[in-house]
């Protein structure tokens, strides 16, 4: 059964998933562990001094961070973020399974913690696929509909909602079919910025070209 992580990887690049399946990474990345730990301290961080906040790995200034946490405190997700009924839960659905960092009950929805940077607006496609997968798995476990998921970026003090719209469900289903049909290395991506940050770029052999070379 595919994991949430495998689906997110396939949404980013199916070939990257092939390499990860062949050579699985060891354990949870340290950056992910630090991000989750940071996300458990919001009640203290929202009132912390600049000096105290500078001791944490934040992606924004202390003033911006406090302002964003104060805005989060006014949202209905604050209780779930700071005192979730479930945390680090293994959720198994009909088609996929994986770990959910936090689970809220009112409303029922999963929260996925990301160590990375948020998109300028909305949620990155791989994270949307992962969020939909987690929401559907949670709905299967609880035998009740789940309408949304949250993606949390603790280093930025940002939380984005992913609704289970028809478009997001379709994106998830396409990715699930791609993962289930993966047999051997998929075709390489060509001339994409995604390859530049890939750990398997050298092994994959994908070549990216500059604008100068294209001209």
Indicate residue ranges for each PLM-predicted region.
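Metal-dependent nuclease catalytic cores that hydrolyze phosphodiester bonds in DNA/RNA
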Residues: 1-108, 208-215
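Cysteine-cluster motifs in flexible loop/terminal segments that predominantly coordinate metals
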Residues: 13-17, 184-215
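Hydrophobic/aromatic-lined pockets within catalytic cores
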Residues: 23, 139, 203
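Short, intrinsically disordered/low-complexity patches at protein termini
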Residues: 41-44, 170, 184-185, 195
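Noncatalytic linker/hinge segments flanking ATPase motor cores
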Residues: 49-51, 141-144, 151-156, 188-195
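Mg2+/Mn2+-dependent nuclease catalytic core
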Residues: 74-178
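Long C-terminal interaction/binding lobes of large macromolecular proteins
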Residues: 181
């Amino acid at each position: 059964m595919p994991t949430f992580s495998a689906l997110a990887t396939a949404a980013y690049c199916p070939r990257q998933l092939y390499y990860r399946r062949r050579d699985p990474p060891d354990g949870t990345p340290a950056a992910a562990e630090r991000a989750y730990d940071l996300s458990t301290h919001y009640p203290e961080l929202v009132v912390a001094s600049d000096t105290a906040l500078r001791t944490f790995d934040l992606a924004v200034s202390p003033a911006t961070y406090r302002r964003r946490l104060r805005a989060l405190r006014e949202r209905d997700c604050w209780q779930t973020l700071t005192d979730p009924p479930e945390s680090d839960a293994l959720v198994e659905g009909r088609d996929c399974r994986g770990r959910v960092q936090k689970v809220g009950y009112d409303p029922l929805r999963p929260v996925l913690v990301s160590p990375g940077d948020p998109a300028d607006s909305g949620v990155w496609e791989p994270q949307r696929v992962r969020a939909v997968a987690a929401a559907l798995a949670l709905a299967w476990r609880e035998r009740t509909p789940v309408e949304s998921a949250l993606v949390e970026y603790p280093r930025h003090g940002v939380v984005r909602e992913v609704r289970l719209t028809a478009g997001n469900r379709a994106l998830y289903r396409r990715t699930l079919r791609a993962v289930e049909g993966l047999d051997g290395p998929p075709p390489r991506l060509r001339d994409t910025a995604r390859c530049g940050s890939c750990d398997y770029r050298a092994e994959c052999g994908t070549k990216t070209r500059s604008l100068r070379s294209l001209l």
